[in-house]
Amino acid sequence: MSTIIGLFTEMLPAGGVQRAGRHVAAVAAKFAAERGFAYRFLSLNDPPGPHTVRVGPAEFLFSGYARNKPQFGLAALRAAGRQPLLVIALHPHLAPVVAMMRLRSGKLRSIVFAHGLEVWQPLGWLRGTALRSADLVIAPSRDTAQHLVSEQQIRTGRIRRLAWGLDPEFEARLRASVPPSRPADFPERARVILTVGRWDPADRYKGADTLISALPRVLRTVPDAVLVLVGEGEDRPRLEQLARDSGVANHIHFLFGLKQEELFACYAHCDVFALPSRGEGFGLVFLEAMACAKPAIGGAHGGTPDVIEDGVTGLLVPHGDAALLSSALESLLADPSRACEMGARGRERVQADYTFEQFQTGLSHAMEDVLIRQH
């Protein structure tokens, strides 16, 4: 039976790339079932053995390889010897595995996803050559697409822009008639600035430290302002120390280990969402905040300007500029009507452009187009 193969870095943990992987796998599994194909999904960094994942009403299976690169590579090569039709790789770093699979099966078509920061610099000979050999490279934003051309020398005809969409579970919560209750430890009677991310040293580009540095100035005009940071990571002690050094520790809350319904409630009960990153390839968290009718503040870099329309659905600020960030926060916290209008515009934009159904349609068309080239 003809098979669609999926290669993933990781799917089970929280995180934007992980969630994107789940979305791609769900769409690919549905695409295969509707056409009488089989599918085989492999994940390099997830725990060993078989796993079942649900995305909305759909379920799919995949095998984890616990960071064992030789076993993962051998499994991919074995899959390439069993009537493979199409291989989809969720990260440019997996492109060399795709290239090896295509050496074994000359008719195998390929799609590789790029995200953002990882393609801002040349990938090196092996990964770069493998990426350039893909039939199609999918980018979530104009910025990522431009870096694929300028830094990776991918021909524009082999690049397709496809924005991510909201998670079906998140969409279902938006349709619920009963508003979510305030999460435990979420501040009450305060103007809440929310940010969501993974707080590891490698993720400092997301700008959590700039948010903390901007808070003292915000408090001068909005004394009941509070910053809520949702997420885990090894950089949390450094951020907590920065909060103490800045004299704002009493105005900062770290929340971690939240369930999806608790994260949704954080969006629903905040006043402003902010992630002043310099390197977002897209930023799924912006979609989630905007879907909950919250104004979003992001970095004026990377793929963020594709999502946030400056002055309409939110505000864009230069990465690392605490003064401009504090001004943006003050302007929205001190003017609830403006914030409400931006939030409403953001929700309209998400409903118009960023649903899971739209992502599913776009990826299905991309797979069809690549397979047509085979004939």
Predicted feature locations:
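Short alpha-helical donor nucleotide-sugar binding micro-motif in glycosyltransferases
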Residues: 131, 257-258, 265-270
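Carbohydrate-associated surface elements
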Residues: 143, 165
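Conserved donor-binding/catalytic core segment of Leloir-type glycosyltransferases
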Residues: 185-206, 212-215
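Nucleotide-activated donor-binding/catalytic signature segment of Leloir-type glycosyltransferases, i.e.
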Residues: 237-258
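Aromatic "clamp/platform" in nucleotide-sugar-dependent glycosyltransferases that forms part
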Residues: 278
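Short hydrophobic beta-strand element within catalytic cores of glycosyltransferases
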Residues: 295-298, 308
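Conserved acidic donor-binding segment of nucleotide-sugar-dependent glycosyltransferases
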Residues: 310-311, 315-322, 331-337
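A short, well-ordered alpha-helix in the C-terminal region of glycosyltransferases
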Residues: 324, 331, 338-353, 359-362
